[in-house]
Curated annotation (Swiss-Prot):
SMART domains in alphabetical order: zf-3CxxC
Protein name, UniProt field: Receptor-transporting protein 4
Homology family: Belongs to the TMEM7 family.
Pfam families referenced in this protein's UniProt entry, alphabetically: Zn_ribbon_3CxxC
Subcellular location(s) of the protein: Membrane; Cytoplasm
Keyword Cell division assigned: no
Amino acid sequence: MVVDFWTWEQTFQELIQEAKPRATWTLKLDGNLQLDCLAQGWKQYQQRAFGWFRCSSCQRSWASAQVQILCHTYWEHWTSQGQVRMRLFGQRCQKCSWSQYEMPEFSSDSTMRILSNLVQHILKKYYGNGTRKSPEMPVILEVSLEGSHDTANCEACTLGICGQGLKSCMTKPSKSLLPHLKTGNSSPGIGAVYLANQAKNQSAEAKEAKGSGYEKLGPSRDPDPLNICVFILLLVFIVVKCFTSE
């Protein structure tokens, strides 16, 4: 499948001109883009989308909600001209051995979502002052999907770019906890309860350690019976010795 990139460019230009009529931006595909490898002055933007693939060998088709899209953006302030380099990451067929990475194809709705999110990123990064900020449009499943993401046949996963392939690095605290911590909700959030319990446990452990250290290092308050017996025997021995010498 081949992306109709001419249509993408036209849609991108319409969205940019609607927001910034005097700005000039170009959008180009670049299959050599690498994550975190940017020239000076460039910025990076990554998103995922719902797309379709077709195997060029067996003609099998499949859908994925983990199609990764990497963009590098640059804007020249004095000329008000900007550039976008975009890379679409492919997937391989599960059924064919030695299959190649196939490029994704997107529905018109998914295409609009991808480009709208890209334009919002540009407006936020380069035209932040006085620009109405909109949240990123989420991925919408066009069909029901079964099973987990096929990381073994995902090009982005093999390159360490796909979020599904880097769960340990991408994990963040749930946003649902933030309102409880910021607004002072009457019922404490999970994060607040966790922090309170953690502080309480640390305080208890400190007290226990301090108490145990005092018992080991400090002097004993109770007299030792053995020492008393030795003292009495020594006293008796001295008295007997005195009488014997007389």
